[in-house]
A protein has these predicted regions:
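Short N-terminal binding/cap micro-motifs at the start of the first secondary-structure element
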Residues: 3-6
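Regulatory modules associated with amino-acid/nitrogen control
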Residues: 8, 14-22, 29, 33, ...
């Protein structure tokens, strides 16, 4: 609770009740068996690149990609409400968030602790009343776990976006001519030189239609 996936659900499905899952595989399975209407899965990040394992899991699922959502990632530096910046010796978060905030971490000369995720790192500080460690997480996580924001823009870059797929068992969505649609292709090629290039050439248009 309080992760960037939670924020993405709030923005794309206002009023919906999110069901947190420990793994992407569990999230996809929950949608497959009908326990939830949609699985909202991060695919790639503008700073960190492709999210590990997702492209391996999608072909194994029986879900369809219905929508996509681009979530702005704004890393906050959070501390326990009883702490001060001069008390901070360590910093904890998910390894990708730590990498995306490396410039300021280096300036503060903090020891790095790897957390399972951003929201869980924030929760740990509150639950264990840790005053010598800061967490990198979202503003939502700070609000949920009652932490104090000491840096509102802690990331190396302000242009940090995560792309999500919204997937479900429904493949027959109503067409809306006022919206723009895209197609996603998932394929594999032989492990030989030029295989990918050959496929790209096949997909190129042979003539321009006016």
């Amino acid at each position: 609770e309080g992760a960037y996936s939670h924020l993405a659900v709030q923005e794309f499905f206002p009023g919906a009740e999110p069901l947190p899952c420990k793994t992407f595989e569990i999230a996809l399975n929950e949608a497959e068996i009908g326990n939830v209407d949609y699985a909202m899965i991060p695919i790639e990040n503008s700073a960190a690149g492709r999210v590990a394992d997702i492209h391996r899991l999608i072909p194994k699922s029986n879900l369809h990609i219905n929508f996509e959502h681009f979530q702005k990632v704004e890393h906050k530096l959070l501390i326990h409400p009883d702490s001060k910046i001069e008390n901070i010796k360590n910093i904890i978060s998910h390894e990708q968030a730590l990498a995306q905030c490396s410039d300021k971490i280096q300036k503060l000369d903090l020891d790095i602790l790897i957390g399972a995720d951003t929201a869980g790192s924030a929760k740990k500080i509150q639950d264990e009343k840790i005053i010598d460690t800061a967490a990198i997480a979202s503003s939502l996580a700070g609000k949920i776990y009652g932490l104090k924001v000491i840096d509102d823009n802690f990331a190396n870059s302000v242009n940090n976006i995560t792309r999500f797929y919204i997937m479900s068992k429904n493949e027959n969505l109503e067409f809306d001519e006022t919206k723009t649609y895209i197609s996603s292709f998932l394929f594999s090629v032989k492990n030989t030189p030029g295989s990918l290039l050959s496929l790209i050439h096949i997909s190129e248009p042979t003539r321009r239609i006016h």
